[in-house]
Amino acid sequence: VCVAVARVLLDIIKTLARFLIRRWHLSDEVALFVGTAIVVVLVITLINGVLLRGFLAGASRVFQPQNTATREGVVQPDRPERSGSPESFAAWDSLGYQGRNFVATGPGAEELTRINGRPAKEPIRVYVGLQTADTDEARMALLLSELERSGAFEREVLVIAPTTGTGWINPIASRALELMYNGDTAIVSSQYSHLPSWISFLGDQEKSMASGRMMIDAVQNRWAQLPADRRPRLLLYGESLGSMAGQGAFDWLPDISRMGFSSVLWVGPPNASPLWRGITVRRDPRTPEVEPRYDNGRTVRFSQGNDASQIAADTGVPWEGTRVLFLQHASDPVVWLSPDLLFSRPDWLAEPPGNDRTASMRWYPIVTFWQVAADLMN
């Protein structure tokens, strides 16, 4: 049997090599090497399910201790507006490493009052960890109870913020929002994994999207029950896998406005993100993949901006309805890593380079995929 399988694989390699010679005019040696690499990748893909499950199980055991740790200097909050406080339904010890960081940090009302020069409210931060309850449904029920307890639905803005793989939320983004609204804010999130993002990115994408959909549906359903004149503005934010998790809640763009979101910011969306990919494929003619334009930017826009002025230039034209902004960089491997890189040159490598990508980068079969993948894991 092994001999027969080997012969079949060898025949496939030879057939691929002949195709590569005709298609790309490669030398015999290079074509044979590339053909072998392709077959190896395909064989690995066939057994990937078994290997991936074992890898994820092993990674979970390795990184579980980190999730139970607490960063030096991080202490349990005593403010009732924070999950993990003595008044909270979510126990401090259950929030995970990143959850404890999130609820224990950030500006308080006193600091915001000093910075903005007017009386501020205490920002609300709601978070549930993997250990906060035994099931996804129980975690969502507790999360809604936390929102009610903390008064989150009475704030000016309510931000749903799906996390990255480890449960991380960008502290700069959270702080910026709280500064803008002088603390009249509530940010809500839920942990779905404790694995590093690059591991979750490679093997746990469906879980992130399912978790994002569950949290967004739960919070939005409760928000929609409020009288229209008493609802906070509903915002959505996500970075990297948090962006993919957020996109998992929507089949297409009209669902975002139908659910009542005022604005959406997705930073560094993974290439497999359903909405991002669909919009990019359907972008307006003659607009680049690295910074596409869709429907002339009426409701969705893309920016490579590195600072507020650049982003403002991309978003300064009047919007219509819900605002959706994708912030992405031309050198971000999370955005550009795709299985398609194995065998076809993407538009972003055929176009003039984006703001921070080297112009010397070229596409080569197989090689470019692994180059970008290595950058992702770096």
What is the role of each PLM region?
Residues 52-84:
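Aromatic-rich transmembrane-lumenal/periplasmic boundary elements in polytopic membrane proteins
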Residues 1-30, 37, 41-62, 169, ...:
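Surface cap/lid and interfacial helix-loop subdomains adjacent to catalytic sites
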Residues 72-255, 264-277:
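Soluble catalytic regions of membrane-associated enzymes that act on cell-envelope
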